[in-house]
A protein has these predicted regions:
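Function-determining surface determinants
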Residues: 1-291
Length: 291
């Protein structure tokens, strides 16, 4: 059974971080090796584990220097091989929710085509051999990581950097908005959430309530991103059985929903990113002294 994604307070920081990184890669390897009947659930588990692994790898960046990008890209490429079916499913779910809220006569045709595209994506089994090969590389990379003597300080620096960049993205989202800005912000939020989970309850800025709010913010931004994917897909809809009008209706509803989600995300962001970075770091001081 996989270990909890959490550092043991009695475990040295360095050993714990390395253990967790290797554990998440092992979870991903096991998840992509499941029988075909369990593939969808396995891919979901693998993608989540790889996201957590990439967050943990951030802590080791100062130790591995220029090789960080290669190691990160190995994890990212493995996840990318598993993304097609997930994105197709997300578009179907988003379109169905929009039509449930404000039905349109021709929406069923559009949703039906999206559903068939999702079925095709699932039928095209991902190259699990390639994914497994990438994960073996990632596993060897993780095993080679040194046990940093100042791992607590490195962890605080990594969490502080994800906060700093997330705060900049939040301010940019409030001022400009836009799909790319929100997508970048979501990535920073996820990194902060993952790193905070490792030390949940051990500082004021990694309390259970804040970790829960970060999870909620990530979900809001994730739903916004799924709608952005849907809007792009709807823009390519051919006029089959009069579906162009329905596709346009769904796209308009998606844009309206995206704006609402972005507003809610920015409001929650004000609570989670209101502190200046130096004040945030001060609240992590106790962790920096851990071995």
């Amino acid at each position: 059974m996989p270990m909890p994604f959490r550092l043991d307070p009695h475990e040295p920081f360095a050993a714990g971080l390395k253990r967790i990184l290797m554990g998440e890669i092992a979870v991903a390897r096991a998840a992509v090796a499941v029988p075909r009947a369990e593939q969808a659930a396995g891919i979901h588990r693998a993608r989540r584990a790889l996201k957590r692994a990439r967050s943990v790898l951030l802590v080791f960046r100062p130790l591995i220097g220029e090789d960080y990008r290669r190691r990160r890209d190995v994890l990212r490429d493995a996840a990318d091989h598993l993304s097609a079916a997930r994105d197709a499913d997300a578009m179907v779910a988003s379109a169905q929710k929009l039509d449930d809220r404000r039905p349109h006569d021709g929406a069923g045709v559009v949703i039906g085509r999206l559903s068939r595209a999702a079925e095709i994506a699932h039928a095209q089994r991902p190259d699990t051999g390639r994914v497994a090969a990438l994960l073996r590389i990632a596993e060897a990379d993780a095993a080679s990581l040194p046990l940093a003597p100042a791992a607590g300080r490195l962890f605080v620096e990594a969490l502080g950097e994800t906060y700093r960049r997330g705060r900049a993205d939040w301010r940019k989202a409030e001022e400009e908005g836009g799909e790319d800005v929100l997508h970048d912000w979501r990535k920073r939020v996820k990194h902060r959430w993952h790193l905070s989970l490792l030390v949940v309850g051990r500082t004021a800025v990694t309390s259970r309530s804040i970790v829960g709010d970060l999870d909620e913010l990530g979900e809001l931004l994730g739903d916004e991103h799924d709608l952005a994917l849907l809007v792009r897909r709807l823009g390519k809809e051919a006029d089959v059985s009069g579906s162009k009008k329905a596709a346009r209706h769904l796209a308009e509803e998606a844009e309206r929903r995206r704006r609402k989600l972005a507003r809610r995300a920015c409001e929650l962001g004000a609570e989670l990113y209101g502190d200046k970075t130096r004040h945030f770091l001060q609240k992590l001081d106790g962790l920096a002294t851990d071995a």
